[in-house]
Every structure is written in structure tokens, then in C-alpha cells.
Amino acid sequence: MVAEVDSMPAASSVKKPFVLRSKMGKWCRHCFPCCRGSGKSNVGTSGDQDDSTMKTLRSKMGKWCCHCFPCCRGSGKSNVGTSGDHDDSAMKTLRSKMGKWCCHCFPCCRGSGKSNVGAWGDYDDSAFVEPRYHVRREDLDKLHRAAWWGKVARKDLIVMLRDTDVNKQDKQKRTALHLASANGNSGVVKLLLDRRCQLNVLDNKKRTALTKAVQCQEDECALMLLEHGTDPNIPDEYGNTTLHYAIYNEDKLMAKALLLYGADIESKNKHGLTPLLLGVHEQKQQVVKFLIKKKANLNALDRYGRTALILAVCCGSASIVSLLLEQNIDVSSQDLSGQTAREYAVSSHHHVICQLLSDYKEKQMLKISSENSNPEQDLKLTSEEESQRFKGSENSQPEKMSQEPEINKDGDREVEEEMKKHESNNVGLLENLSNGVTAGNGDDGLIPQRKSRTPENQQFPDNESEEYHRICELVSDYKEKQMPKYSSENSNPEQDLKLTSEEESQRLKGSENGQPEKRSQEPEINKDGDRELENFMAIEEMKKHGSTHVGFPENLTNGATAGNGDDGLIPPRKSRTPESQQFPDTENEEYHSDEQNDTQKQFCEEQNTGILHDEILIHEEKQIEVVEKMNSELSLSCKKEKDFLHENSTLREEIAMLRLELDTMKHQSQLRKKKYLEDIESVKKKNDNLLKALQLNELTMDDDTAVLVIDNGSGMCKAGFAGDDAPRAVFPSIVGRPRQQGMMGGMHQKESYVGKEAQSKRGILTLKYPMEHGIITNWDDMEKIWHHTFYNELRVAPEEHPILLTEAPLNPKANREKMTQIMFETFNTPAMYVAIQAMLSLYTSGRTTGIVMDSGDGVTHTVPIYDGNALPHATLRLDLAGRELTDYLMKILTERGYRFTTMAEREIVRDIKEKLCYVALDFEQEMAMAASSSSLEKSYELPDGQVITIGNEWFRCPEALFQPCFLGMESCGIHETTFNSIMKSDVDIRKDLYTNTVLSGGTTMYPGMAHRMQKEIAALAPSMLKIRIIAPPKRKYSVWVGGSILASLSTFQQMWISKQEYDESGPSIVHRKCF
């Protein structure tokens, strides 16, 4: 990145500090704009540094120029200051300091993959590099190579799996399932899963096969592993789960499948990254959007306390930042260093992100302010206020208004200007009026009683009538303009009207009685109104008596000064004094003048009363109009309020309906989703059935398909493949369960043990045989034996092979149907066939006609067969076989002094019987020899080292087959049973039966059995008939060998029962096709 100067030492004298060099080599040219290729630095380009000592390296670092380190040079933000300011420290300390250079010196490398020396919270992606295995052929065995390459034929792979442990691990702890899953060999994965291999095995990096399948994007293998129950939440050595790798690969379908199978969406790796934080850190916008829809935690923190928003800002991804802001994420959260997302955006010069954060903050502030001023609450308050106002108007409760309408103020100003305008033209009359108004001593502005009469007060202008009319109009206009003002100041016009009427009535009453009323206080507006009314009344009186100039001012003055009351009316005069009146020269004239004045006075009072009444009515009408107008306005506002409330309730109902529709849509979507899932399941089942049908067709068309042959004996189970000479698996048909619960946690004690494993642990187990006398009595244990046969002994999948089963003659029909049902429904076999054991034994000897005496561990049968067909009416059954002989030997050994009581000890006695016992040709003679000599005695060493001696017991035990009375049974011996079976057959075939008597079963393996049978049957049969006893050397397995021969025939495919036939007819089809 940066070039070297001439002062750099030679390359041969340098040592390579490889960690620092690898970090320095990954810084990009954007962080070193001026030093790249220049002579200002001693450090060369990426990977081109020479080896030097620590001192030389520090001297180089000190010569980096200030242009490449604008803020750290000489500041406290970096531990690498100016040239020569370095401390002497080890390489480790220097590396730790270099990791602390601030983001201003490394603007583009911070938080990105270009540098390993970024911010203090950067992560490495070594866990996601090179997902596939590095495989060398010499490190893998045969099975692992087949699993990795997947180019092995299916048959060969099946054979390989049969002989190899499917869970075997190589040097790197990889199983075959790991390799097949990582390389996408779905066929091999399916075979391994069918063999029930272990699913959660970890390789050297603690990854399961599912983790490798997801990491390598092998979706088909991953889905198969999920369906078989692999845990998707097992972390590897980096702490990553399968969901982390799916998110890193931007595989939304796989991520969705993992979540459906229980993957933890909030799991964290060793860096504290959840799948969402990993997607943000790697700038995977689509999967981030997917995880947000899946309700991933947006406030999750990594190990440095950083949220998804801070990581998105550090990565410079404006699109992810915008996506997160749409989810109302907290933008004020801080990491462990105390920095917020905005501070990171500013320090990294991400202007677009800064703008996004600013816009988001403004929207949040607007949202908060709009929530504080809730329109619905304002509507409610407005409605309540209007209701209170309307209620207050009805209850006559006046309200105070903070402001008057501007028009009222303008009206007042106009009236005052008009009055001033007319004052200059009506000086004389207004002076008289003003003198009359202000002459009294009261301070209420009303007209007091006149004290003196002067000629100056009786002077009027010539144009009296014109002035009078002008003044009347002026006063009338002024009153009309003042009336709305008075009504606006009072919030209850009806009450004011009522009070005004009452006051006027009181005034009239007071004027009649000559008693004026006094008021303690009154608003200024009432005082002004009284003055105007008084002036108006004076003008009206002047109009009535316009011809007499003296009377008008006299009456006006007398009316104004008659009393000191504040009601504004004109009371009558109470007294006449000589000082206040001028009399004429003669007494008669004085009398007539006084009478005329009294009459005139009375008439004026009546006129004043009528005028006042008319004015009151006019005032009432105007007030009523004002009240009606206000009521109309109130009714209009109430109507608007009701309309608004109705509209609000309608909107609420619509919102409720929308919510109900939304809930209904959600419910319908859930039902559709459930239906889709059910459809998917049904389709999967149909596909599985089709696959099984295809497999069955392949098996039918392929002549080389191996048929499994299983001989279910009462004591031993023999199993193998058709065409083989001998069975591959022979084990006791026995199931053992622990007698007591295991006390040690590490013993891995099973619930049950089968076959040889059960026999080897018989000391701590309770052993049971699921078959008694050739009939299955415990189907659960029998199913365990079959499962053990398929998966542990033969290591095959039963759903891939047809099966031939054997059964004893005279088996109940219900047992056959149950056996058929288990094979098709539990083990999903494609086809099966059931054959009688005696017939298969005859096939082994190469005959189709003869009589088979089959004696095993639980039962003995004699079955006559002619041309391959058994004769059921001549078939006989004897419940005397090897198990009864074992019990008899235990009894006679106990009589000898040896104690055998438990099930485990019984197995020891069975081993003695099979190894030492034989059939005596002449039982009486043998008994005599044993009694006279000890040469017939034999020794047997028990498992504990004890040696027991056996005398005549070793031939007395098999003698019970010929003399059942030894066991307390009243039945015939095996020789008589064979003879009786022949005699029940047709006469024409008896000769063939005598000459083809075949011995079969493990109980017939005693030495001397064939000779004794020849002797006993010859003694019973007619002398002219030839008796021939056939005893094959491998008659212990003759039933299984006969089944192998039958299943290998080309016509066997036409004999078996297919899965399709079973589905159509049920278990009862076994009687029609097999018997």
C-alpha cells in the first residue's frame, strides 16, 4: 500500500513480523491516499515488506506522513504519535495499539472486510470460508469414498453398508453422512438414513451433517435430514447454527424450512450475532427483510452491545438502515463504547444515513406532538363546552367574555363621532340639556331638581323644530347602535329583558307615588342608558308643547330636578316656594296659571308614561330578536356538534368493521395456510406411495433382487438372502429385560436385549421366548426380534426387499393375518410370502413327495406331502420337542445333586444337552451298562469353573422323545406319531411315504436318531414295506435352505403377496395366496 524510502535497510537483514504484515497488507489505498507509491513511508505495498527488526519497524511506522493520519498524528486518539514518539514495547503490544487507530484515519476500512484492523467490534468470517471439505482419497475408507463420490451402484452400496459400521468416523471425525450431505449425494444420504445412522454426530469443527448440508447449500439433503429429526440448533465451534449459515448464503427457502423445523431465530454465535445481526453485518438485505417478517428481535445486541441499526450504519448500508427505521427501531441505543448509530454515521461520513436518521427523528417528534393533541379528545372537550354554554344560557348564568367583537367597538366610535359632529349645530339646546343633566348634586348623572329659573336658561334658537327633529334622529340612531352592545355584554338577554321590565315598572310606580328608588350600584352601561332616555323624554316633551317656549324648558327643568333618585324618571314637584316661582300681578291670573300648570303637568306625566311604555315594548322586541338570534346560533352550533358526534360515531363503527374484517381475513388466511399444509402432507403421502410402487415395480422387473428368507423357530431364528447356501444370521429367539434398574449413568442400559446379546447377559436379565410350541404368543417381543433381524443382523431396509417367512403347520389363521399385517404396515415390505416349514424341508432334500418329521425347540410335526401339496388331514402335532427335553435334563441333574433353577442356568443345561446327549439304539441295554460301569460317565465344566459329572442322564434325556411317559405325558412317541400320520394318508401313497421319511429340525440332530427311527418304524410297519429314513447332515437349517431355494425360483414373484394386493384385500389375502 505504501512505498519505501531510500533509507530502508537491505532485504537480507530483515525479519518478517507476519501478523502485523498481514494486517498492514490488507488496508486499502483509500486509507493511504498519499503514501501509496511515494517516498513518504518506509512500509511497502501489501505483502512486499522486508524482514526487519523491531526497532527498524518502529522507525518505519514513525515516518508515515500526516496526510495518511490526519487526526491521530500527535493526538490522543492513537497510540502511534509523531515520528520518534513510540514506546519500546513487544510486538504483541504494538499490534494491540495498531488495532486502536481511530475511524478518521481509516474511513473506508472500518467495519468492512478490507482490513483486519478495523473498529474494535469487527468480526472475522473464517467460519464461512471454504464450506466444503478438503478430501484426500488416501484418508477415506471404502464407505467414506462411496459416500463422498456417490458413483457406486446401489446394490454394491447396500452390500457395503451391510458389512460396515455406518457411524464410523475418519481422522477428521467425519461420518459417511457428513461427506454425502456436504457433496449433495442425496441417494447415499437416504440409504444411510434408512439404516438409522446417528444424525447428530459432530466432526472436528463440531458440525453435524445438517450443518454441512446447509453450509454447502445442498437443500435436498438438508430437507431429508430435517424430516428424520436432525436438531437444527446444534452450534459448531464458532457458535453458528444452521440458520446462521442459511442467512449467510441468502437462502431464504432453507431458512424458512429451518424455522418450520424449530430452528432458534435468536441463537447467537461466539461473536454474539443472531441470524438477524449476521445478515445486517454481511449486508444481506433480502434475508434481513425476511427475518423481520418472522418477528426477529430488532433490539438484540452483539457482544459489543451493538444493535442491528448500529451494525447497519457501521457497514454503510443505507437500504438496511431504511428498512430498520420502518420498523420503529430505537435509534438512541448505545453500544459498550457509549456511541449511538448517529455518531457512527457522522464519524464515518455516511451523509445519506445521517439524513435518514434525521428524517426519522423529525417524524417521531411530529408523531409525539400529534398524539399529545388528540383530535378525538378535542372533539369531546368542544362538545362538553358547548353543552355547558347552552345549559348556562338556559339557567340564566351569564358568562364573562374576554374580548368583545370588533364590530361593537367600531359602532361605539361611530356613534361618538356622530354625536360630536352634531354638537356644534345644536349648541343652545344641548347646553340646556347638559345644564339640566349636570345641575344636580348627585354623582349618578341623572337630572336633579331645578333650583332657579333664569332667562338665560330659556333661550332657544329660531330653527327649533329642525334642531328638534335632528336631535331625535341622532338619539334614536345612537340607541339602536348601542342596543347590540348592551346585549353582547350580557350573556343572558332574557334575564336582562325581565329585569329591565321590572325596573321600568318600579320607576313608573315610584313616579306615581312620588317616591324614587335608590340603587347601591349599577353597571355603567345602565347609567348611560338612563341619561339617553331622560334626554329623549325631554325632547319628546318639547315636541308636544313646542308653541310655548317657556313651558318646555320649565317642564324639562322641573322634571329633571324633581328628585334625587337614580331611576332617571321625572317625578312631580312636591313644593312651591315663592323663591322658585314668579307670580303675575293679579291673583286671578295667578290662580288660572297654577291650574293650567297643574293640568299641563298631569298631561305631560301621562304622555311620558305612554312614551316610556312604548319604548319599553320596543326595547323588549329588540332584546327578543337578539335572544332569538343567539338561540338560533346556539341551535346551529348544537346541530353542528350533533352532526360531528354522529360522524365521529360513524367513523368509529367503520373502524370497528374494518378491524373485524381484518380479523376475518387473518382467520381465513390461517385456515388457508392450514389447508395448504394438509394438502402438502397429502401430496407427500401420495409421492411416498408412488415411490414405493415404483420400487416394487423395480423389484418385480429385476430378477436379481434379493429376497429375505426368515425362519421363525421357537428357539432359534435363521435369516439370510435367497440363493445363499446357509443363513447369514442365526441367533436365539429370545428377548431379555433387566431385572433391576441400572444405577450407573454411564452404563447405557437398554430397555431390552435380543438374541446373542441377551444370552450373553443372562445373569442380569429376565429371558422370555415370544413363541411357545411354534405359535407366537407375544407380538411385541416378536416384532423386536424381526427388527433386530433386519437392522442389526442383516443390516437391510425391509421396505426394499420382499420377505419369505416360515411358520409351523396348523398355525391359527389369526396369527398368519397378524404376521402379514406387521410386515406390510410396520416394516413396509414391498412383498411377502408365508410357507410351511415341513414343505421347505422337503425341498431341501430334493423331493416333492414324502413325510417330514420336523422337531425343533417348541413343537414336533409330522406332515405328509404328495407332489408338493401337504395333507392337512394327516398332519399330526406333538407338543414334545427340545425345550421339554431341556426341562427334563434339569430335573434329572437336580436328582443327581446339581441345582439348576434360573433361566440363565437353564441355558447352561441346554448347552449340555446339545453337546453331550445322544439317542440309544437299545435303551434297556444302555441303562444296564451305565449301572454296571462308570465308563459312560462324562464331565462338563460350568462357566464358574465347577465341573459336573453326567452318567446315564445323557441318553436318558433324548429317550423321552420315544417314551413321553418319562415326562408324565400320555401321548405317543415321535415314531408312533410318524406311523399314525402315514396310516391316515391314502393307501396309494403310503409306500412312497415309508420310503421318504425325512428328519428335520434341531432336535433330530442327536447322534443315533436316524437308526432309532428306522428300528421303531420298521417294528410298526408291515414287514414287506421298505423303510427309509433320510437325515440330511444340515437338517438343523433345512427349513431355511428350502426357503432360499423356493425364493430363488423365477416363478416365486408370481407367488408372493404385493403391497398393492394387501392394500386392496387386507391381511386375509394370505390364506388365498399362500395356503
Swiss-Prot record:
Residues 413-436, 642-698 form a coiled coil. One of its GO terms (cellular component) is extracellular exosome. SUPFAM superfamilies: Actin-like ATPase domain, Ankyrin repeat. Residues 369-530, 544-597 are annotated as: Disordered. Residues 377-392, 401-424, 466-483, 495-530 have a biased composition (Basic and acidic residues). GO terms for biological process: axonogenesis; cell motility. Keywords: ANK repeat, Coiled coil, Repeat. PANTHER family: ACTIN (PTHR11937). In the N-terminal section; belongs to the POTE family. This is POTE ankyrin domain family member I.
